[in-house]
């Protein structure tokens, strides 16, 4: 069977049973975009303004609603309206990291009620398989998808080696809900026990630390280009934040220009990858 990264996003959509994964891949194919914009701002108005500006160019918006100082339920309603308007999915970057019962409550309840509106979320595999079963008990009936943090883009990250292998094996055992990884390269086949057939494995790989202009941010973040991430390392979605919206969310035209620029670069890298493997 053809390896996942040799297929188009549209072809891969047909291989997934998880609704969130299927919807994301179909959106990527339809919009010709593998760009996710990470919006880390503290005011609702700024978040919504940035999302409305980048919406036409993205497949996925990544949020951290716990940093929004004036959060209320109306923000979620407005964010969902923008997702409908611009045809993208929502990924709340919650990075759950507790026991199953606790994460189930964090996912379903509290102020943010993440499962009710976020198509995709993520978790650290540190607690073991119970974190997946806890989140799945809430998210799977709603058609949500989970990403595991198998690798990180920060200097000195401990998510390497046996840790990464264990994360992939946990995903392999929970394919109905775990749709892929936050990682820096393809994870298909990594850490597979002897005798396990991994030829048809297909995990989505979403990759932060993507930049066209800088190599780092002075706080440990390391950047690679879309060509390196998508074409060379086979990742699926590039995650870009400050490289698009900078420090001033009011600069709408510059934000739009950067979003269009990253969309084009990410898609070109994907086309090169697929064409090179035909």
UniProtKB/Swiss-Prot annotation:
InterPro entries linked to this entry: Aldolase_TIM (IPR013785), OMPdecase (IPR014732), OMPdecase_AS (IPR018089), OMPdeCOase_dom (IPR001754), RibuloseP-bd_barrel (IPR011060)
Keyword terms of this UniProt record: Decarboxylase, Lyase, Pyrimidine biosynthesis
Catalytic residues in the record: 95 (proton donor)
Gene3D superfamilies: Aldolase class I
GO terms for biological process, alphabetical: 'de novo' pyrimidine nucleobase biosynthetic process; 'de novo' UMP biosynthetic process
Any GO MF annotation of the entry: orotate phosphoribosyltransferase activity
Catalytic activity: orotidine 5'-phosphate + H(+) = UMP + CO2
Residue runs in coiled coils: none
Binding residues annotated for substrate, in chain numbering: 40, 62-64, 93-102, 223, 242
Enzyme class: lyase
Pathway as given in its UniProt record: Pyrimidine metabolism; UMP biosynthesis via de novo pathway; UMP from orotate: step 2/2
Organism superkingdom: Eukaryota
EC number: 4.1.1.23
Family in the record: Belongs to the OMP decarboxylase family.
Protein name: Orotidine 5'-phosphate decarboxylase
Organism of origin: Schizophyllum commune
Lineage of producing organism: Eukaryota, Fungi, Dikarya, Basidiomycota, Agaricomycotina
